[in-house]
């Protein structure tokens, strides 16, 4: 019986000798078939090797990343062979608040909106304008400010909000979108709401925690990148802690200040991009001052051809 063109061997050689001669006698023509078969295999491997070599030498897409961290306007100059870029836009975080003596801990600031990474087509442009949003100013109520917007071309991320009392600031979100709500003020401050998805490539900022009127302040909400909000400051049963700021792009929000009979009750100004500032803890010695929110960032990862 033949198997795919190989004749059945009538009798196999049993002693070492001229195997080729014995095999040819046992199955006439099989040597020629084997030679043709292995020659074909060799040709296929040779062709495969040349194809792999061609793939290895072929050019692949490379990237060129530029990061903008200085607040204010900038101009991005495209690389000559860039076709577009993956862009991430992070807005500034809102400043935390301090309240008057006896009013409780201040609310933490909300973190800035995050847009991207999203594909931005170059469309033959030589430059594209953008801006990095400032962090909001932490202050005694009602003087704290919201974080600034960040932009790149037609992309805009909205800054996190501040507050005027013990309630945490809302997370940054565009007009018409319900932003995550700040934690409520109470004996113990409520936690700020986590970020919320806006679309396939955009997410709101996280809200700040509420200040406590006697006990701990609430934590800030979790950011789109999974960063935790700042922890609320501790209270002492009389003076409440400040609320934590909303979580940022690359780190946590600012921690709230601790409630205390005397100063300091200083909250934390975060370093994470777009994070909200912590709210001041309550004291009997005067109004507290909230911490600044963190500025935003714009990352442009060009794809080159």
Regions found by a protein language model. Name each.
Residues 1-49:
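Extracellular "spike/adhesin" assembly and maturation modules
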Residues 39-70, 211, 222:
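Glycine-rich, low-complexity segments
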Residues 237-242:
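Short Lys/Arg-enriched alpha/beta "domain-start" segment
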Residues 96-104, 109-230:
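Secretome/extracellular-domain signature
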Residues 67-79, 89-154, 246-265, 276-300:
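Glycine-rich strand-loop-strand elements at beta-sheet edges
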Residues 302-305:
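Ser/Thr/Pro-rich, low-complexity mucin-like regions
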Residues 83-85:
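Short beta-strand/loop motifs in extracellular/secreted proteins, especially
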Residues 157, 273-274:
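Bulky hydrophobic/aromatic "packing anchor" residues in well-ordered structure
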